[in-house]
Amino acid sequence: SSAASDVYKRQQDGVSAIQVAEGALNETHSILQRMNELATQAANDTNTTIDRNAIQSEMDALSSEIDRIRSTTQFNTQNLLDGSFSGKNLQIGALSGQNIAISISNMDSSSIGVSGLSVSSFSSAGSAMTKIQSAIDIVSTQRSALGALQNRLEHTISNLDNVSENTSSAESRIRDTDMADEMVNYSKNNI
């Protein structure tokens, strides 16, 4: 039916939006891991000022890249990672109330706590490592929540496919039975 295909399309759109956000967060996660490597490297007092400045420059560029990812990750013209994709409902069934809520937190460098990190000294690099680990935890938690939603949607889609197939099969059997009954009646009446 048209309603079932509309629901199916909305479910597929939900999966697609989640996959777009998850892909972007995967990249953010990789950037944070690189930032952690750099902070660990900077936490070594054998570094010269030139070394630490080079590390700081890369840290700043990586933080800016997190912000770029946050501001450019969209699905159907909607920003996914700027905090505005919150409390969104996805209709997953043909009836009212059959929906799943999706919320994605703001994933910019400031919101996850890695904006303006300094690695200019042993102690600031150590502090940066702590903040980066916390950011990794925030991103991982959001990714886990999205993964759970995606699994739920995929199970719902499989169930909708199953219900649709079983309904079609039942309708076919009913039509076949009706046709057989009509043939018997026709034969009886024409003898």
Regions found by a protein language model. Name each.
Residues S1, S5-I191:
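Primary detection of the long, small/polar-rich alpha-helical "axial" segments characteristic
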